[in-house]
């Protein structure tokens, strides 16, 4: 059969057949169905692979009449042409070796189409248009002591499907794998307390915290404040300009940015000081609201935003978090005269989706 390859923006779809009206038998690729035959951690060329177990093909043959066989694999490196060509050449070899109807979804970006987010699975389901529910998914990344991650277990759980380890499927070994919610999340379980504070005269409110900490959620609960944000205006310079213009109206302003560096906050303190010197209106009070959830919680919420918006809300990349953490200067009373600092933690009623740590 002809092998069809379609290269989408965020993933590649490869198949040699149409979908049938059957449930899905889902598999990860590396260290679930195959491994490098060189013994190295990563394949060095398109020929550097072998089946993980001797019975992989015979097992797939045994389930093919009952299931659509689908591979879901994260392949971040295949954005580059050379890596993509090597990967596709290897996939063609694997399909030819298996000699069965097969479908492969290979994620090539970070975001909704990358496991454990559910984009690949949802795309597959939409292609089948089937009402079957007895799917399963098999993968090696399950959070065991020697596993590099728990991505596959999370992917199955996020899609509410049965999870199996390769050893369970191909060697019939029994296992009992469960996901344990990490303490960096469970410490924020519960209902969020409503943030209340008194405002006397015109007030400039600076939000402070990592992306995903819940700054905008707090801002949306504030009455009588006009928001200024990089997300809507695009640059810091435009935020400063907009704040200056709003101060001319003597109204309450909230700056909904990370504001994690002292230098950034000082720019707004300067506006308030210039305001006092110019005597254009009542002096602006400054309140800094520091959302102090740990960075792992914030990265989790960043992934959750991407998941719930089905990729419309783009992921803030890991490197941005690491850079912010390295440079973060949390607010202190000594920064400015008559400053008020409020610390607040965002809370979550219930965790449903599972995502990897930073």
Residue ranges with predicted function:
Residues 2-69:
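Active-site neighborhood of HAD-like aspartate-dependent phosphohydrolases
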Residues 113-127, 133-171, 175-184, 221, ...:
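Conserved GTP-binding G-domain of TRAFAC-class P-loop NTPases and closely related GTPase folds
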Residues 204-223:
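Glycine-rich phosphate-binding P-loop
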Residues 217-266:
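Conserved substrate/cofactor phosphate-moiety recognition/catalytic segment
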Residues 280-301:
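Conserved phosphate-donor/acceptor-positioning beta-strand/loop module used by diverse small-molecule
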């Amino acid at each position: 059969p002809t092998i069809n390859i379609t290269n989408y923006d965020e993933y590649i779809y490869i198949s040699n057949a149409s979908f049938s009206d059957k449930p899905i038998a889902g598999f990860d690729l590396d260290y679930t169905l195959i491994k490098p035959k060189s013994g190295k951690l990563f394949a060095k060329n398109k020929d550097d692979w072998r089946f993980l177990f001797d019975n992989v093909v015979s097992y797939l043959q045994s389930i093919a009449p009952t299931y659509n066989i689908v591979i879901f694999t994260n392949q971040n490196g295949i954005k580059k042409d050379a890596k993509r060509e090597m990967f596709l050449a290897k996939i063609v070899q694997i399909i030819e070796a298996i000699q069965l109807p097969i479908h492969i979804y290979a994620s090539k970006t970070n975001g909704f189409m990358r496991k454990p987010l559910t984009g690949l699975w949802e795309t597959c389901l939409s292609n089948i248009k089937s009402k079957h529910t007895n799917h399963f998914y098999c993968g090696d990344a399950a959070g065991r002591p020697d596993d590099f991650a728990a991505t596959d277990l999370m992917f199955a759980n996020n899609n509410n499907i049965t999870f199996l380890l390769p050893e369970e499927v191909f060697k019939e070994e029994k296992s009992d794998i469960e996901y344990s919610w990490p303490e960096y999340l469970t410490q924020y379980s519960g209902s969020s307390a409503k943030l209340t504070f008194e405002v006397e005269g015109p007030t400039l409110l600076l939000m402070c915290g990592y992306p995903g900490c819940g700054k905008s959620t707090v801002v949306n609960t504030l009455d009588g404040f006009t928001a200024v944000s990089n997300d809507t205006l695009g640059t810091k310079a435009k935020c400063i300009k907009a704040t200056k213009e709003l101060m001319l109206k003597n109204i309450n302003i909230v700056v909904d940015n990370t504001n994690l560096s002292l230098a950034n906050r000082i720019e707004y303190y300067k506006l308030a000081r210039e305001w006092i010197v110019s005597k254009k209106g009542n002096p602006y009070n400054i309140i800094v609201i520091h959302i102090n959830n740990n960075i792992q919680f914030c990265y989790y919420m960043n992934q959750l935003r991407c998941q719930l918006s089905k990729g419309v809300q783009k992921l803030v990349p890991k490197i941005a978090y690491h850079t912010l953490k390295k440079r973060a200067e949390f607010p202190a009373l000594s920064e400015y005269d008559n400053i008020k600092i409020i610390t607040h933690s965002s809370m979550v009623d219930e965790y449903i989706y599972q995502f990897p740590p930073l």
